[in-house]
Amino acid sequence: MDMTTLLNVDRVNKQYKDSEFKLQDASLTISTNETVGLIGKNGSGKSTLINILVGNRHKDNGSITFFGEEHAAGDVEYKEHIGVVFDDLRVPNKLTIKDIDKVFQSIYTTWNSQKFFDLIKYFELPLQTKIKTFSR
């Protein structure tokens, strides 16, 4: 494997109980500093694959390597180097921006509150407003 390979997904499979859906032989390679978008029809497995990559779901089989090393589903270290934008924010709608900062500080060891609040200030977002009121 070339050392510029950041993430390698090789023949990853997932099938849900009581469902006809199958993610079959999903494979992709992402190089360092590369931005990737997953495109496909509804139900093709895009969200399932992303959820496997970030540890929200377990794969049935196949391999996922980060800089050439296989990582377990609960392994947080490599996930801090992957950015994912979901269709919905995976935090309760009743939280405020200040609350989100506290939550993310507890999850991500590399969370940068200063950068976060610099962006909040730049976009002129109110700190005490619940996130459910913001547009996507």
Task: Enumerate the predicted regions with their spans.
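Pre-Walker A (P-loop) beta-loop-beta motif of ABC nucleotide-binding domains
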Residues: A26-G37
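ABC nucleotide-binding domain signature
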Residues: G37, E80-D87
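Conserved ABC transporter NBD signature motif
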Residues: G62-A73, Y78
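The feature captures the beta-strand-to-loop junction immediately N-terminal to the Walker
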Residues: I39-K41
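A short, flexible loop at the N-terminus of ABC-type nucleotide-binding domains that lies
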Residues: D2-A26, D75
